Amino acid sequence: EAYGVKDYVVVQKGDVKAAVVGVFGKDALECAPTCELKFKDPVEAVKQTVEEIRKNEKVDMIACVSHGGTWEDENKSEDEILAKEVPDIDLIISGHTHSELKEAIQHGNTYIVSCGEYGRNLGSLSMTQKQDGRWELTSYELIPVSEEIKPDQATQEQIDALMDTVDKNYLSDFGYTREEVLAENDVEFNSLEEMGTKHEELNLGDIMSDAYIYAVENSEYYDGDPVDVAVVPSGTVRGTYTKGDITVEDVFNSFSLGIGKDGVAGYPLISACLLYTSP
């Protein structure tokens, strides 16, 4: 409550009044083992919230935005379990597992949709309310996001304003602008997907670990001891580098997670000495 987090919000669009619930899944929490936040069981939490909505709100639809995900094994598929356990949900917009569902999953009167990952698709669907008050999915498609789509001018103006804010309030402290070119690249770096699926040496990880070493050895706090190993957690890598110009924005996108104790965006870089004794 101190951070303005609500159990649900009610949205009015035309003649339709919908309650939207958000939930964080079990596997998602396990992916952040050092997280100090504690969550209720997602199914029980959503069930309780839906009961509250039914009691206190007159809505036509209940939608759930979930970071639970879907798996091939239906018995382990968190959002499918959620659909079965909380049948009053009309629509689950699923995330976390990056699943690209070409067709919606249906359990009872609940539909589950997911459009993949990294903004590559836009999900579009239509639903029609039935006589019993529930909803039927009448159309659903994934629209690839490409340069063929003409930008909406009003939305683009908002994006440009936010980008200017990033330049002024963040990057200017380091003497950079987001479009500034840092390097020319002629290397075919590994894709982001390969970082998470290939358990082997990758050139994307190599350049990032080399950057860690460079940053430590050029820090004002460097004590002169050589750096033997640099560790790059693959889950924190959020972008790769394509051939051509590498800009400040490209580099930031590849390391865009986290925040330091000083409030500055980005995980802090730390150095440590590992001691061992000979057998």
Task: Give the residues covered by each predicted segment.
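Acidic, metal/ion-coordinating pockets
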Residues: 1-148
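Solvent-exposed loop/linker segments at secondary-structure transitions
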Residues: 54, 126-278
